[in-house]
């Protein structure tokens, strides 16, 4: 299972002051995703391949063991759609985490499953 996370959408789903430090908020999300790489997510047992898609002010977030970071040159949604298409071409099941309805429509056209931000925010993010 490939878990593709729309970082901007997931970080923005909780009004916790993320707008003051987008990179820091995205790094906290990245760190929380490490557990999902080992344990799995939303009915999909681990291990899973976790891909965090970043853009804008969070483009410089570095990967960590268990979480691959993909920085979008332009639209994060376009990159997520491309990654979902690659997963389909590779025959890899894919779950995209976002609340963005249009993005959900685009990735399901590639056969991806979708889940909301709560799927990966079940635990408090590290501070």
Regions found by a protein language model. Give the residues of each.
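Nuclease catalytic cores that cleave nucleic-acid phosphodiester bonds
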Residues: 2-4, 11-127
């Amino acid at each position: 299972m490939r878990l593709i996370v729309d970082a901007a959408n997931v970080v923005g789903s909780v009004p916790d002051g993320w707008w003051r430090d987008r990179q820091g908020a995205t790094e906290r999300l990245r760190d929380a995703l490490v557990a999902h790489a080992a344990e799995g997510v939303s009915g999909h047992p681990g291990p899973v391949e976790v891909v965090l898609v970043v853009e804008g002010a969070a483009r410089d977030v570095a990967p960590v063991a268990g979480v691959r970071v993909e920085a979008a040159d332009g639209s994060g949604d376009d990159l997520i759609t491309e990654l979902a298409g690659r997963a389909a071409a590779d025959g890899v099941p894919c779950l995209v985490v976002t609340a963005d309805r249009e993005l959900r429509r685009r990735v399901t056209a590639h056969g991806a499953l979708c889940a909301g931000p709560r799927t990966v925010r079940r635990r408090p993010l590290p501070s």
